[in-house]
Amino acid sequence: MNFYRSSIISQIIKYNRRLAKSIICEDDSQIITLTAFVNQCLWCHKRVSVSAILLTTDNKILVCNRRDSFLYSEIIRTRNMFRKKRLFLNYSNYLSKQERSILSSFFSLYPATADNDRIDAIYPGGIPKRGENVPECLSREIKEEVNIDNSFVFIDTRFFIHGIIEDTIINKFFEVIFFVGRISLTSDQIIDTFKSNHEIKDLIFLDPNSGNGLQYEIAKYALDTAKLKCYGHRGCYYESLKKLTEDD
């Protein structure tokens, strides 16, 4: 387990009862450690993302396709030119075709690579802004990324899932808190109102009963955990995100 990489896991364990056994999900670029806790005392942390695993009324899991790959974002972000070039030359398969073309022109480097078109998927959410609590952060991020008002979103706050994400390509660790929720819209209705934006290129919908990949494994763990008894919780069973925002 990567618990020693976490900045908040000791506080979470101290104040929240573990609800389910930890699992590890991994693919060729990420290793994710997930642990479910009864929500007894949770607070926003400026370095920890808050995300929602949301089910539609036609029983589909909402997932967002990022506009930029994780690797491209890291190459743009880092100021070290040697690191930029090293990441590009060694891992260009983890970029989209457009990103490879842009960086090839920028660096005047043309690495031998397969003709794949990388797309990284995430659940809607992000890092809370200063002064935001969990409901406010989720409301803002879901609206910005998916264009869904919080009146259509219902969150199960009886429990949460702490995730430690190791990106083995850029050699960094990230933390996230997942909540399970529902959207009172069908997948088609969500597609009709969605607007591509600077962060999210498009949406995909997963079948919760079958699939593969990291996003499916995360969702399966979360949905299985939602069936457990959350004794001692201080949350709500699918409360309106709008009401949670107003109450807090």
From Swiss-Prot:
The active site is at residue 141. Gene3D superfamilies: Nucleoside Triphosphate Pyrophosphohydrolase. It is found in: Host mitochondrion. It comes from the Viruses. Mg(2+) binds at residues 132, 167. Mn(2+) binds at residue 145. A motif (Nudix box) lies at residues 126-147. Keywords: Host mitochondrion, Hydrolase, Magnesium, Manganese, Metal-binding. Residues 45-227 form the Nudix hydrolase domain. It holds the Pfam family NUDIX. GO terms for molecular function: metal ion binding; phosphatase activity. Its cofactor is Mg(2+); Mn(2+). Its EC number is 3.1.3.-. It is an enzyme of class 3 (hydrolase). Decapping enzyme that remove the protective 5'-cap from both host and viral mRNAs to commit transcripts for decay by the cellular exonuclease XRN1. Preferentially targets spliced mRNAs and since all viral genes are intronless, it preferentially targets host over viral transcripts. Acceleration of the turnover of cellular transcripts promotes the shutoff of host protein synthesis and therefore diminish the magnitude of antiviral response. Belongs to the Nudix hydrolase family. This is mRNA-decapping protein OPG122. The gene is OPG122.
